[in-house]
Amino acid sequence: MGLSDDEWNHVLGIWAKVEPDLSAHGQEVIIRLFQLHPETQERFAKFKNLTTIDALKSSEEVKKHGTTVLTALGRILKQKNNHEQELKPLAESHATKHKIPVKYLEFICEIIVKVIAEKHPSDFGADSQAAMKKALELFRNDMASKYKEFGFQG
């Protein structure tokens, strides 16, 4: 299920467009996640009181968390599936401390693809979208596998 060199080139090519503005991309991803899947917001004590879109948009903590999420994902993507060193601590914290279900990873990965498509329509064609979806599926599967190693069925 690995990606070809061409697919990785598509993934990293679009990621190079995302990286200069991780905070805006990340903020949009987190806000959309909370809008579409309100149960995910309940996992974050610091975001529970942000009950409106305006409150989410004006929250520096939401922007900061979105940046953190996309920064970590970018480091993993750049490893081109040789991401054990980056993935293991992320999986451990999400499995043992935060208890984030794999389903939530699926939600956020779908939203990441949608946000990139909206922000970069001319650079994120069908081949790039397919490659990114495949890379994110690989990420999710590897996270799920690590979760099991840490005793979390998520």
From Swiss-Prot:
Its main location: cytoplasm. One of its GO terms (molecular function) is nitrite reductase activity. Heme b binds at H94. It is found in: Cytoplasm, Sarcoplasm. O2 binds at H65. Monomeric. This is Myoglobin.
